[in-house]
Amino acid sequence: KSDVQFFRIVASSFVGGVFLTLCLVGCGKSDVVSSSEDEPNIDIEGNELVEIEPDRSLILHNPFTEWVTYASIGDGASTTYWSDYDNMHTSEGSVVKVSDYSNTLYLRGAWADFNPEDGVYAWEDECTTQASKRLKGFMEEAEKRGMKLAFTFVVDSRDKHDNFTPAFVKDAGAKGYETVTGSATVWSPYPDDPIFQKYYEKFIYALGERFDDPDKVQFISGTGLGKWGEYHTVWYYGTKVEGKEELPIRESVFDWATSLYADAFKRVPLLINFHRWIGTGRDWVNESTYDEDTERLIGKAVEKGYSLRHDAFGMHPYYGNWEREFAQKWFYKRPIIMEGGWVVGTHRYWTDSEGKYREGHPEDVRNGEFKDAQEAHVNMMDFRIGNETETWFGKSFDLVKRFVQEGGYRLYPSKVSLPTTMENNTSVTLVHYWKNIGWGYCPTNMPQWKNKYKVAFALLDTKTENVKFMFVDDKPEACDWILGNEKEYIF
């Protein structure tokens, strides 16, 4: 069964107690495919043309599109999360459920919370930590609301007040370093350390056994390394302590981490962060400076099946010309999802380099994020958590609804040429035309979605509407349906 929204076209005549329907299914035979940029090929004797107007306002809850809601299982997490998110006030004066607009619950948390002891995992019944209880609660509530899960598992403790790598990894002899966040001294492992890699591999494979399920999980963000799990400012033992050249170590770790996730997750889409300093040990320099090996390395991850995410949309210059140009190179080859960069409750967002944000006006930031997302043709946008979510709904609800109407992918059959009558033991010709009115695309060219969604015509029982016969047109690919184009297929 496909979880892509079904579209039904009823023919004007019925044959033998069945009627014709058109749908997208999870995996037939096509004669010709052509572009309808030329004169439509609809003059078929005995056929009738059905033209369809799209419903732009319906929230479809389709896979790998729509808004993403964030949550935390760590200490300090909200105890009123669902009551708050089920009663969100909007700038229109209404009160809505966030989950009505979002089909993904994203948990970005510490490896230590998901794996508190060697061989003990937070999703298991035997684990009774507070983080485990929160995780199980979120999983249960997400399922009630028809939301899929998504994850990032962070190992780096910098900029945190707790250790994000489990204590047993350090106790086993993994090499690492201490940093100070406020009054807290925290420890992070070097990702080129073999003891760290041994335990992280064990954890990721355990995750794959439990969560490599596309019916339950929307995506996994790999690799969890660097600051915030975004592959920023990565420090290596070989470089920091032994003084070796960074690139060979950096590339070796990158290859190891991306291959690890790709081996553990074969059915759920994987994401890799893109920014100009992937895996390097340095921080931001300026808008015109970038690492020359970054684009090549990200390309290696994409070849392994990764799609793309960036976590500073609307935050300039960190989402700058390099990032924009990089995203453009991957339009419709791999889907892109976004996360905003500015935290409007604590950051001085009005200092943004583009000079378009006013102090005291978080809606300016929301508008900047929206414009960057539209330009990048993203499939998914983020509500994030707390004040970010509140300002999306309370200050910029019009943009929340616009993304539902315009963002991601919205597929529909714009015209279908159908036979008015059919006889048994004869052949008929159908012509169908498809449009996408979203700025993203349906990523059936991701390896995890290979042959997952196909167009099919079916004959249904008029009394029960059960499928009696199904005919799959294997030529159309939904990833080819791009905003502004209409595709024609003869079947």
Residue ranges of model-derived segments:
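Bacterial Sec-dependent N-terminal signal peptides
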Residues: L20-E48
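Catalytic-core regions of glycoside hydrolase
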Residues: I44-S91, E143, S221-G229, V234-N387
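Aromatic-lined substrate-binding rim segments of carbohydrate-active enzymes
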Residues: S94-T179, R250-P269
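An active-site-proximal structural segment forming one wall of the substrate-binding cleft
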Residues: A131-E143, A172-S221, V253-L260
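Aromatic- and acidic-residue-enriched segments that line the glycan-binding/catalytic groove
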Residues: R158-G182, H232-K244, N286-E292
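Catalytic cores of secreted or luminal carbohydrate-active enzymes
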Residues: V365-P419
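Short amphipathic, basic-aromatic surface patches that mediate peripheral association
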Residues: W434-Q448
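A beta-strand/beta-hairpin structural motif
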Residues: K468-F491
